[in-house]
């Protein structure tokens, strides 16, 4: 059975939406997804506000309240019928996120066994046929086939198969 690894943030969980919401509320601004086209949030806001961005990510409840990406639950459940599915999240970038990410996955994806959740900073260690991720840095080093999940920051990235949503993931893997 072929193996698919799936990133969590910006693929299964809308971390960017929550990050924008908290940033905009804190500063009374209206930064939008369109403002981020081809850029990370960190590149759009002034460097004197990076500490607030970091504090948002490190807040205890940040990863608990993320919205689920539309159709991800249904499609991942279907994928499990034909593939070995693992969740691979780069939690090392925000060490305070381990427990919250686990709780979030248990709440929204209870059908994914704990043994299929991998916390890793460098996804080149994964042994899988496919990796679905929004971060091209992770795909570059991955040994299998990288699938780029669209997010505002990666809109200018080429060189990978791209999916824009979970319906396209479903079509790609299940026809």
Label each residue range with its predicted role.
Residues 55-88, 94-99:
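Short, acidic loop-to-helix structural element flanking the phosphoryl-transfer center
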């Amino acid at each position: 059975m072929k193996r698919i690894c799936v990133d969590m943030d910006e693929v299964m969980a809308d971390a960017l939406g929550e990050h924008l919401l908290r940033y905009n509320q804190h500063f009374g601004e209206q930064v939008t997804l369109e403002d981020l086209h081809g850029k990370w949030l960190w590149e759009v806001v002034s460097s004197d506000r990076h500490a607030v961005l970091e504090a948002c990510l490190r807040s205890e409840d940040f990863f608990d309240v993320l919205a689920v990406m539309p159709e991800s639950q249904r499609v991942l459940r279907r994928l499990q019928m034909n593939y070995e599915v693992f969740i691979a999240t780069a939690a090392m970038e925000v060490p305070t996120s381990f427990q919250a990410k686990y709780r979030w996955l248990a709440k929204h994806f209870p059908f994914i066994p704990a043994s299929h959740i991998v916390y890793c900073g460098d996804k080149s260690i994964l042994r899988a046929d496919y990796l679905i991720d929004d971060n091209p840095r992770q795909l570059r080093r991955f040994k299998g086939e990288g699938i780029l999940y669209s997010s505002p920051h990666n809109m200018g990235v080429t060189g990978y198969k791209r999916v824009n949503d979970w319906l396209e993931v479903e079509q790609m893997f299940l026809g």
